């Protein structure tokens, strides 16, 4: 069926092309398609922003010079049900490892530390009404702040996901 459609399209394209330029030959397979050929789009780590981690369990992903910051799954599990988030104001300038807020749960409170230097450009307003998003979706909807990066080379000092997993195993032992 697909080959029939391709041949029909090719024939239509050739007839249109021939009408506008009769001297030009139409190749039998102008797009070099073979029967059964399928073009796929792959998504994977190479196409996605890489998540980096700190020893204090914050993570950051970057896109176009903007970092999105949150806490790791390990941290949210250790905290328990988050009931309150204290976040900085937009425009706050942070240096790497500066304290920028806190999360409170029924079990404990934990300070938040900036993984990189930069300026806060956005805070997750949804956490004011629903701080439990940190527990439900710590890597997606439960992000904390977005920030510009004043020194992107600091990313190199953070742990990859694999290194972070090894780090967690080492502190659990």
Curated annotation (Swiss-Prot):
Domain Lipoyl-binding, chain residue ranges per copy: 66-148
Residue ranges that the Swiss-Prot or TrEMBL entry lists as coiled coil: none
Residue numbers bearing the N6-lipoyllysine modification: 107
Transit peptide (residue range): 1-48
Mitochondrion recorded as keyword: yes
Compartment list: Mitochondrion
GO terms for biological process, alphabetical: glycine decarboxylation via glycine cleavage system
Cofactor: (R)-lipoate
Keywords (A to Z) from UniProt: Lipoyl, Mitochondrion, Transit peptide
Note on how the cofactor is bound: Binds 1 lipoyl cofactor covalently.
Domain of life of the native organism: Eukaryota
Cellular component aspect of the GO annotation: glycine cleavage complex; mitochondrion
Biological role: The glycine cleavage system catalyzes the degradation of glycine. The H protein (GCSH) shuttles the methylamine group of glycine from the P protein (GLDC) to the T protein (GCST). Has a pivotal role in the lipoylation of enzymes involved in cellular energetics such as the mitochondrial dihydrolipoyllysine-residue acetyltransferase component of pyruvate dehydrogenase complex (DLAT), and the mitochondrial dihydrolipoyllysine-residue succinyltransferase component of 2-oxoglutarate dehydrogenase complex (DLST).
Record text on subunit structure and interactions: The glycine cleavage system is composed of four proteins: P (GLDC), T (GCST), L (DLD) and H (GCSH). Interacts with GLDC.
Family of the protein in this entry: Belongs to the GcvH family.
Protein name as it appears in the record: Glycine cleavage system H protein, mitochondrial
Organism: Oryctolagus cuniculus (Rabbit)
Gene: GCSH
